[in-house]
Regions:
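A short alpha-helical cap/connector motif
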Residues: 1-110, 114-139, 143-200
Length: 200
């Protein structure tokens, strides 16, 4: 199966809501049978964790979440021997120290955790050092607040302290120290269907 079919099978919104499979199939296809390390930030019910297991036959999947909404014991994919999970706040300074002790470098890091500018910036700053020089870091569901009248969207207005131009600019400033590529999958219905890909 291709990645879109795998996402759909596992009821993962990277296919059903967003079209992220278009980018990931392109970037990941050459690594399907390689022994690589993937870090996923934001586990939730494990739909994407299971999808990575199904797609990558040899990859080790590391996944991090606060697990405040779903107990890890209730996520079947976390029981796989190729998965290692962490109960952690990806924005905390302690998180970086804990991962430093693991002495692991990742081929791909996918941030599907907090979908706020500050949360994405802090997570990025915590984990970018653990990306291999040839690796790629993906920030999903980015609200591009400087365009498409996104500041007036009801969700943004409902959370005024989380979505500010200042915090958005801080995110952009932080990632712009590296090579950044934008992938716009957004629509009027789903304005945050946007990925920022970062390479060293």
């Amino acid at each position: 199966m291709n990645l879109k079919e795998i996402f759909i099978k596992n009821k993962c919104d990277k296919a059903t809501k967003h079209r992220y499979y278009e980018l990931y199939e392109q970037d990941f296809n050459g690594f399907k049978n390689n022994e690589i390390n993937i870090l996923e930030i934001g586990t939730f019910k494990g739909e994407s964790t299971q999808s990575w297991l199904d797609y990558f036959s040899q990859a080790k999947i590391y996944t991090a979440d606060t697990f405040e909404r779903v107990s890890p014991e209730k996520v079947p994919s976390l029981k796989d021997n190729r998965v290692q999970w962490f109960k952690v706040d990806s924005t905390s300074s302690n998180c970086k120290e804990n991962f430093k002790n693991l002495n692991i470098q990742f081929d791909f890091i996918i941030d599907d955790g907090l979908h706020t500018p500050e949360g994405q910036r802090l997570t990025f700053e915590n984990f970018i050092d653990f990306l291999k020089p040839t690796g790629s870091y993906y920030i999903e569901d980015v609200w591009m607040l400087n365009r498409n009248n996104n500041m007036s969207h009801y969700w943004v207005k409902k959370h005024p302290n989380d979505f500010t131009i200042e915090k958005y600019n801080q995110l952009i400033e932080s990632i712009n120290k590296f090579k950044v590529t934008e992938y716009d999958f957004s629509s009027k219905k789903i304005p945050d269907s946007f990925i920022l890909k970062i390479n060293k």
